[in-house]
Structure formats: structure tokens, C-alpha cells
Amino acid sequence: MNKKKLALFLILLALVFYPASGENQSAQTIKIMSFNIQTFGVTKMSRPEVVEILVGLVSQADIIAIQEVRSIRIDPVQRFMALLPEKYGYVIGPREGRSSSKEQYWVIYDTEKFTVLKQDSWPDTDDIFERSPFSVYFKTSGAFDFTLIDNHIRPSDAENEIRALPAVVTYYVDLWNDPDVLVMGDFNADGRYFDKTLLNSIFPEDKYRIIFTDEDTTVAASRNTYDRFIITSSASDYFTGNFGVIRFDEVYDFSGYSIRPSQVSDHYPIWAEFYVDHF
């Protein structure tokens, strides 16, 4: 990717991330992204064009909750981090999974805007989840300290795992004594895996806000909202109302390159914006 095209790509991404809005733009806000990066490891890091696009995507957010890190080795993660601006740090969860194909959750964050207070992998004593949710408790410069819960739901057991998520939320609200919780990730909460009409009963509106409801979050020809942000009602007080899906196959022109959009990922990144203080 030449510098001119990369610059254009980043400008277009900025337009996607900073939509016109009637909200007061002088208030300090943060942008949080969730991204199933699809089988991240040595092979993906060996494709320079893929890596440059991923770096461009990730660099537009303040926190990025990543799913599907498959590499046994840590060096692909470290090499990717070295390509990001120095302000970014990360935490990474344990390798999770019942089979030999295990995954890690990876949360990248702007160290100038956030402090990691605590991190934890949910103690799944009943073995409900294929990959136990990974939680990070963040402190901001304002009143909005929050727990981020990163999760990747198993497609073949989506309903059982999704139904267990409110218990995970309650666990961390009690453990860290903070009602502000953001649950995000690849829920596989649509299509043949899950009846998405069940979400409103699992996450009732008096306790939660479901930000993504009918947006297409998959690169495939089918239209499904697999990826989600679900936040507690307390956290919704900080939500600006701005959110979106980064359809990188439309933002970026792939015609002159050897890679296909599906080699970047089979999912689009999703994002939501929050105030750091009550506004």
C-alpha cells in the first residue's frame, strides 16, 4: 500500500468514525471498537497489505477489544503492537478453548487516556463457555470508569452462552463494585446460530441497552448482526448515541492489490462512542 493511498484510507476512516452529529463535540469522548480479527497469528502477520489495513483500522479507536487470536506464540501480537503509535498498550487473556484450536482475547488501549485497574478471565466453574469471557476494568480521566467484557460466543451453542452473559455482568458489577459494564465481541447472535429476537428478553431494557440491532457486521454476502455492544443502563448514561460498522471493503479500494477483503477479516469492526463524564 503506497503512502498516498494509505493517507486517503485513513481520511476516509476518520469520516466514518467522526460522523456529523448534533451532540456537543467539545465534550471529551472515547471511541471503543470490537473486532473479530479472524485467526490472528504468524500467517496474517506475513501479509503486509493485510497488516497495514489492520493497523489503519485499529489506530482510529481508543480501545479495541479483539477476538480470535489463534497464535500459540506471542510475537505476532508484539510485532503488531510495534507498528502502532507508541501511546497504545495492551492486555491479553489466557488461551481459551476445549479443543486444540484455542484463542485469546486481546484488548488494545490508549495509555494516555486509560489506566487498567484490573483484569480477569471469568471463572467458568460449570464450563458454560467454550472461551470464558475476558474482563478489563478501565479508569478514565473522568467519572466513567467501566468494565469491558470481551467475548467470542461459540456458534453451535450460542443461545446457552448468550443466556449466561448477564450472570457474567453481575459477577463483575459485584466484584469491582461498579455498575458501568460494556459487553462486546462476536456474539454469533444472528442467522442460523441464534434467534436474535431473544436478545430483548435476555437483556431487558430496564437493565441493558443493545446498541447494534440490525447492522450487517459480516464481510460475507449474507446479512447478519453477529457482533454486538450490549451495555448496562448505568453505562448508557455515557453513550453519545454515535456508533457504526467499518465496512472496510467499501471504505478502501482493493482493486489494485493482491489481497481480498476476506483476508483482512470475515467480520467488520464495530464501534461506539462514550463521554468520559456525565454530560
Model-derived segments and their meaning:
Residues 72, 159, 171-179, 189-279:
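Metal-dependent phosphoester-hydrolase catalytic domains
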